[in-house]
Regions:
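Catalytic alpha-helical scaffold of carbohydrate-active enzymes acting on polysaccharides/glycoconjugates
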Residues: 2-173, 178-217, 242-265, 271-312
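A conserved mid-domain beta-alpha-beta active-site/ligand-binding segment of alpha/beta enzyme cores
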Residues: 220-251
Length: 312
């Protein structure tokens, strides 16, 4: 049943729950921090259907050189296309090598276009026993409020089915392109068998959402700490990102002595997979891995553990 609106809430998608009022959360082996690394594998469309709302960062400005809206759609966005293609041709392999080095199984967010057209990347993930989650249709085609409920249902279903076909396993996690949802999205995801969603960056622990049917949990990604928003749009240098990610972990680790926290690191191969940036990811992962009490997990493993705990 949907949550009742109450103190602190202006929607009924999940209950109001201050972290200080919750039971203590313990991760496996009494770890302080659960670390998950989500890597977006995305395709930037050469062309998109007419009147398609295109991806624009919440911080302002398009991801490529052009917005795709008149008059800029008179020619393809080669800049945006090239950036994302670089990630799938080159950058992803640097990220996977760094994750291998520290024994981290990735959670790979696939959009439909990647699932359909990049079987080599699927195989690389399968070699590492990665978890694959659904990530919309493409980087430029996002969920938006102009969709009817049935249009959004078909969008979600097409994404899920593409990942299932490409990987041989139906995904149970969802990461919306550009973190975009409508008020229908959680209900539609749960109805399609999705168990967790990564769009709600409002907590440091998982929590149960309240769809009309099915069961859905939040594994929140803090958008302003992902490599795109903090580095490119946030105009932080890569050295600053390195420091901020370490300080993020240090804060979670300190608070995790009292109750478990999670660090969901959200990465884009075309950004952090560049040769002058990858060293900083390696250093951050090395710093996190040097601490006792860190549980390295996939998104699904974190949700499975959380679900098995006493009623929260």
């Amino acid at each position: 049943m949907p949550a009742k609106r109450a103190y602190g809430m202006d929607q009924d998608l999940y209950p109001w729950s201050p972290i200080v009022t919750r039971p203590v959360l313990r991760w496996p082996d009494n770890a302080r921090v659960a670390l998950a690394v989500i890597v977006n594998l995305e395709h930037w469309d050469w062309e998109v259907p007419a009147n398609t709302p295109l991806a624009v960062s919440p911080l302002g400005g398009p991801e490529g050189l052009w917005t795709g809206n008149p008059p800029d759609n008179r020619f393809p966005d080669i800049g945006g296309y090239g950036n994302h293609e670089y990630g799938n041709r080159v950058g992803i392999f640097r990220i996977l090598a760094a994750l291998d080095k520290y024994g981290i199984r990735p959670t790979l967010a696939l959009d439909k276009a990647v699932a359909d057209h990049y079987p080599f990347l699927i195989k690389e993930g399968q070699k590492r026993d990665a978890e694959f989650i659904a990530h919309g249709l493409s980087r430029r085609r996002i969920i938006h409020i102009g969709m009817s409920e049935d249009e959004e249902r078909q969008y979600i279903r097409a994404s899920i089915e593409a990942v299932a076909k490409a990987t041989g396993k139906r995904p149970t996690g969802w990461s919306g392109p550009d973190f975009q949802e409508t008020l229908n999205t959680p209900n539609l995801l749960a109805a399609e068998g999705i168990r967790y969603v990564c769009d709600w960056g409002n907590d440091e622990q998982p929590y149960k959402m309240t769809p009309k049917t099915g069961e859905l949990y939040s594994l929140g990604v803090h958008a302003y700490l992902d490599d795109n928003y903090i580095h490119l749009h946030g105009r932080r240098t890569i050295n600053e990102v390195n420091l901020l990610w370490r300080e993020w972990f240090e804060g979670l680790y300190a608070d995790g002595a009292n109750t478990g926290r999670m660090m969901v690191l959200h990465l884009h191969p075309w950004i952090i997979g560049q040769p002058w940036r990858i060293r900083h990811l390696d250093e951050v992962l090395g710093h996190v891995s040097s601490h006792a009490g860190v549980w390295k997990a996939t998104g699904g493993e974190i949700i499975d553990w959380f679900k098995a705990q006493p009623v929260r």
